[in-house]
Structure formats: C-alpha cells, structure tokens
Amino acid sequence: MKKIILTGDRPTGRLHVGHYVGSLQERVRLQNSGDFDEIYIMIADAQALTDNAEHPEKVRQNILQVALDYLACGLDPAKSTLFIQSMIPELTELTFYYMNLVTVSRVQRNPTVKAEIQQRHFEASIPVGFFCYPISQAADITAFHATTVPVGEDQMPMLEQCREIVHKFNAVYGETLTDPQIFLPSNKACLRLPGIDGKAKMSKSLGNCIYLADSPEEIRQKVMSMFTDPTHLRREDPGHTKDNPVFIYLDAFSKPEHFAAFLPEYSGLDELKAHYERGGLGDVTVKKFLNSVMQEELRPIRERREMWAGRLPEVYELLRVGSEKARAKAAQTLAEVRYAMRIDYFEDGNLLK
C-alpha cells in the first residue's frame, strides 16, 4: 500500500507561528523525509465558507496568502501537491454519500464540533454546512486514500469520526476506503501555542497572533507585549515557567545555538528556567532573548515569502496544476466508491444482461 499524506488549512487569514510549530514544519520534514509516496496539501476554501458564507471575498483573497505561507515555509510543489478544495467537485459528491452513514447525534457528540460551535456562537443557529464539516473532512481524507493525516491534538475527534465512516462504508459496501492514521507533532511543546495575550489558543479572530509574514518590528512589538507570569511583578520575585507563554514559545523555538549567539551566560533553556523560577531574572531580558530567537527563525521564511510574492502568476499556475492532479486522484476514488455502491450504471456493462 502506498503511504499517502493529506492535510491542509482553511484560508481565513494569513498563517501564524502556531500553524508553523503545530503543523507546517512537520509537513516540511515529512515531505523531505522521502518516506511517503504522495503528499496532498489542501487549501480548504469550501470548508472556510461554512462559517464565512457571507464573506466570500475574504476566503478568495486568503487563498493566495496561504499559498505564499506554504511556499515560504518550504513546501515544494515538486514533492507535495498543493491544491484548492473547491476545485475538486468529487469531494462534494463523496460527502453526500457519506452523510447516509452518520447520524445527527453522532456529529453532535463530536467534541471538536461542540467547541467550534461555541467559539463561533452558533448555538442558536448552526449552518448545515458547518455542522456537517466532519463528514466533508472524511471525504477530503478518503478521496486521496490518505494513510497519514498530520493534525493538531484538537483534531483527533475529527479523524476518529472519519475512521468510523471508513469502517461503516467498508462494512456495508466492501473494502474500498483506506483507514487513515493520525500523526501528531513530535515536539509536545508544539501541539498548540497560546496567543501572545496568554489565551489558550492563538487565533486570527482574537488578534493575538504572530504571523509568518510579520515584519521584524511587528514581531518585536508583539513579543515585548507578551503576557507572562502575573505573579512575577519584580525582577527578584520567583517566577513560574509552566503555562508562561514566553517560555512556551522558547520551548517551541529555541535551540542551543541561540543561547550561544544571543544569551551566552546561560548554557541552555533549563538553566534560564531555573534562574527565572528562583528569582533574579526579569521578564524584559527573557522577552529580548525570545525576540532574537523569533527574528532568527522567521527571517528566512519572510524572505522566501517576499520572493514568491513577486512571482504571483507562477504561484497561481502551481495551484492550478496541483488542483488538476488532485482532481484526477479524487475522480478515481469516486469511481471506486460508485462501483462499490452499485451506482455506476453507465460504466457497468453487465447492467442489462
């Protein structure tokens, strides 16, 4: 069996460092590992419209922004197929068939769906398209016979629901769909970065993000304004590093060479944490170090992004070619599904015999 990856992002805004440590850098590593036969990276515009139906221009404009972020982070169209979800109509047909295999109560029990309904204040009036997006995700994954789905920990219930659909379909119609496995980030600190305001989630809608496209000055301002330990009021006060956003970011981004270059008086992060926890280390010193680390890590990404931004026709062509390739793969899967369901009427030469 081929080893195939399917993953992607909703184009509701530029991607931020939470996306980078939570999924993008892992995708690039997997892409360059040579361990996978096919890799599909989807810009999920159709899914984005489930809660942005009245703002299609927002989705349209951000398709290009997400594509630029992908290329800037190192996703290579020669190794990974980058495509736009809505350009693959087969996904919609697969979603329709899978709806017959899932109950309303099962979707309602999905923890991710419940959390996102609450976050978007949809409790009183849930758009049907949004409510059904776990089924749409199952179509996305199975259309490419994905064996591996790199996602954040919060998406585990979605993949479990996808696997239930796969098992039900195969039990009813015969072995047709591939059972996918979740792939979590290898660095536990990178499962989810908090926002710079200390809130649990970095979110475009909350305005608490550091974007991959941010300028050096924007990065500096955001880092220096970050929430820290509220009990660490004075330099000499003992501080807490656990649940402290500045140290969570250092867990995710700092490397030994950063200490050698920017903070040589410390041997590494453990020594820095120990000093902060016993007192005598101010937040400004730690934030300045984090700023140096972030500038170093994000500089090459920003430079590649600026390079691709000057070649927009080429970016669109990459997306067009990728979408054509992805559609051919999805069409093949849809034919297999229709055959299994016995609704391939005009393809079945034995129908009238």
Feature-to-residue mapping (PLM):
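Extreme N-terminus of proteins, especially the signal/transit-peptide cleavage junction
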Residues: 1-3, 346-347
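A generic structural motif
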Residues: 11, 149-150, 208
